[in-house]
Amino acid sequence: AALRNWGALTVANTMTLHSGATLYNKGTITSKNISINSNTKIVNDNKISLEGELNLPSNFSLENNGEIYGEKLIANSDAVATNNNIMKFTTISLTNTTVNNACSMEATTSFYANGATFNFTQGYLKAPKMEFVNGTVNLSDGSMLDATTSISIPPGYAKFYGKGENT
Protein backbone atom coordinates (compact mmCIF):
# COMPACT_ATOMS: atom_id res chain seq x y z
CA ALA A 1 0.00 0.00 0.00
CA ALA A 2 1.13 3.54 -0.69
CA LEU A 3 0.39 6.66 1.34
CA ARG A 4 0.85 9.94 -0.50
CA ASN A 5 0.90 13.22 1.39
CA TRP A 6 0.97 16.42 -0.65
CA GLY A 7 -0.58 18.63 2.07
CA ALA A 8 -0.38 18.80 5.84
CA LEU A 9 -0.69 15.58 7.85
CA THR A 10 -0.76 15.75 11.65
CA VAL A 11 -0.81 12.59 13.78
CA ALA A 12 -1.46 13.07 17.51
CA ASN A 13 0.45 10.00 18.67
CA THR A 14 2.33 7.48 16.52
CA MET A 15 2.12 7.11 12.77
CA THR A 16 2.51 3.41 11.87
CA LEU A 17 3.64 2.09 8.49
CA HIS A 18 2.95 -1.62 8.06
CA SER A 19 5.10 -4.13 6.17
CA GLY A 20 5.26 -3.44 2.45
CA ALA A 21 3.99 0.14 2.75
CA THR A 22 5.53 3.14 0.99
CA LEU A 23 5.14 6.72 2.22
CA TYR A 24 5.62 9.52 -0.30
CA ASN A 25 5.73 12.94 1.34
CA LYS A 26 5.73 16.19 -0.62
CA GLY A 27 3.88 18.05 2.12
CA THR A 28 4.41 18.37 5.86
CA ILE A 29 4.09 15.52 8.36
CA THR A 30 3.98 16.21 12.10
CA SER A 31 3.79 13.26 14.50
CA LYS A 32 4.98 12.08 17.89
CA ASN A 33 6.78 9.03 16.41
CA ILE A 34 6.88 7.08 13.20
CA SER A 35 6.71 3.34 13.82
CA ILE A 36 7.75 1.20 10.89
CA ASN A 37 7.60 -2.49 10.10
CA SER A 38 10.19 -4.15 7.88
CA ASN A 39 10.10 -4.00 4.07
CA THR A 40 8.90 -0.41 4.16
CA LYS A 41 10.01 2.73 2.32
CA ILE A 42 9.78 6.48 2.95
CA VAL A 43 10.49 9.08 0.28
CA ASN A 44 10.48 12.55 1.84
CA ASP A 45 10.57 15.53 -0.52
CA ASN A 46 9.51 18.20 1.97
CA LYS A 47 9.35 18.11 5.80
CA ILE A 48 8.82 15.56 8.58
CA SER A 49 8.81 16.78 12.20
CA LEU A 50 8.74 14.27 15.06
CA GLU A 51 8.52 14.88 18.81
CA GLY A 52 9.94 11.41 19.42
CA GLU A 53 11.67 8.83 17.28
CA LEU A 54 12.07 7.53 13.78
CA ASN A 55 12.93 3.85 14.12
CA LEU A 56 14.13 2.21 10.91
CA PRO A 57 13.91 -1.60 11.17
CA SER A 58 15.58 -4.20 8.98
CA ASN A 59 14.90 -4.12 5.24
CA PHE A 60 13.85 -0.48 5.34
CA SER A 61 14.64 2.28 2.87
CA LEU A 62 14.62 6.03 3.53
CA GLU A 63 15.22 8.63 0.83
CA ASN A 64 15.31 12.15 2.26
CA ASN A 65 15.33 15.01 -0.23
CA GLY A 66 13.74 17.45 2.22
CA GLU A 67 14.05 17.94 5.98
CA ILE A 68 13.57 15.48 8.84
CA TYR A 69 13.70 16.56 12.49
CA GLY A 70 13.17 14.48 15.63
CA GLU A 71 14.35 13.34 19.04
CA LYS A 72 15.86 9.97 18.06
CA LEU A 73 16.92 8.28 14.85
CA ILE A 74 17.38 4.55 15.38
CA ALA A 75 18.31 2.31 12.43
CA ASN A 76 18.88 -1.43 12.48
CA SER A 77 20.29 -4.15 10.24
CA ASP A 78 19.83 -3.90 6.50
CA ALA A 79 18.21 -0.47 6.72
CA VAL A 80 19.39 1.95 4.04
CA ALA A 81 19.10 5.70 4.58
CA THR A 82 19.92 8.17 1.82
CA ASN A 83 20.08 11.81 2.87
CA ASN A 84 20.21 14.49 0.18
CA ASN A 85 19.24 17.46 2.36
CA ILE A 86 18.79 17.91 6.15
CA MET A 87 18.39 15.33 8.92
CA LYS A 88 18.63 16.63 12.49
CA PHE A 89 17.97 14.58 15.64
CA THR A 90 18.96 14.84 19.29
CA THR A 91 20.51 11.35 19.17
CA ILE A 92 21.37 9.04 16.29
CA SER A 93 22.03 5.32 16.85
CA LEU A 94 22.82 3.05 13.89
CA THR A 95 23.51 -0.69 13.91
CA ASN A 96 24.52 -2.58 10.73
CA THR A 97 22.98 0.14 8.58
CA THR A 98 24.04 1.73 5.29
CA VAL A 99 23.92 5.54 5.19
CA ASN A 100 24.47 7.54 2.01
CA ASN A 101 24.87 11.19 3.02
CA ALA A 102 25.20 13.96 0.45
CA CYS A 103 24.26 16.90 2.67
CA SER A 104 23.63 17.71 6.36
CA MET A 105 23.21 15.10 9.10
CA GLU A 106 23.34 16.25 12.72
CA ALA A 107 22.90 14.76 16.19
CA THR A 108 22.72 17.59 18.74
CA THR A 109 23.67 15.35 21.72
CA SER A 110 25.28 12.10 20.56
CA PHE A 111 25.96 9.86 17.58
CA TYR A 112 26.63 6.10 17.80
CA ALA A 113 27.36 3.66 14.97
CA ASN A 114 28.07 -0.06 15.25
CA GLY A 115 28.77 -2.04 12.08
CA ALA A 116 27.39 0.73 9.88
CA THR A 117 28.65 1.72 6.44
CA PHE A 118 28.73 5.45 5.65
CA ASN A 119 29.17 6.83 2.17
CA PHE A 120 29.66 10.60 2.33
CA THR A 121 29.54 12.47 -0.99
CA GLN A 122 30.15 16.10 -0.09
CA GLY A 123 28.01 15.64 3.01
CA TYR A 124 28.83 16.13 6.65
CA LEU A 125 27.99 14.65 10.01
CA LYS A 126 28.01 16.87 13.09
CA ALA A 127 27.63 15.83 16.74
CA PRO A 128 29.26 16.81 20.04
CA LYS A 129 30.07 13.15 20.75
CA MET A 130 30.62 10.48 18.10
CA GLU A 131 31.36 6.80 18.60
CA PHE A 132 32.20 4.42 15.76
CA VAL A 133 32.41 0.69 16.56
CA ASN A 134 33.18 -1.57 13.60
CA GLY A 135 31.89 -0.43 10.24
CA THR A 136 33.29 1.67 7.42
CA VAL A 137 33.30 5.41 6.71
CA ASN A 138 33.95 6.57 3.14
CA LEU A 139 34.60 10.32 2.86
CA SER A 140 34.56 11.81 -0.66
CA ASP A 141 35.20 15.34 -1.99
CA GLY A 142 34.49 17.95 0.69
CA SER A 143 32.94 15.48 3.16
CA MET A 144 33.46 16.11 6.84
CA LEU A 145 32.97 14.72 10.34
CA ASP A 146 32.56 17.50 12.92
CA ALA A 147 32.81 16.06 16.45
CA THR A 148 32.72 19.21 18.58
CA THR A 149 33.55 17.49 21.91
CA SER A 150 34.89 13.97 21.31
CA ILE A 151 35.16 11.15 18.81
CA SER A 152 35.72 7.54 19.86
CA ILE A 153 37.10 5.03 17.37
CA PRO A 154 38.40 1.87 19.10
CA PRO A 155 41.64 0.73 17.41
CA GLY A 156 41.14 -1.89 14.72
CA TYR A 157 37.35 -1.72 14.71
CA ALA A 158 36.28 1.04 12.32
CA LYS A 159 37.75 1.71 8.89
CA PHE A 160 37.98 5.21 7.46
CA TYR A 161 38.70 5.96 3.81
CA GLY A 162 39.06 9.29 2.05
CA LYS A 163 39.34 10.35 -1.54
CA GLY A 164 39.33 13.64 -3.39
CA GLU A 165 41.31 16.84 -3.24
CA ASN A 166 41.24 17.45 0.51
CA THR A 167 42.20 14.08 2.00
Could you describe each region identified by the protein language model?
Residues 1-167:
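Extracellular beta-strand-rich, repetitive "passenger/adhesive" scaffolds
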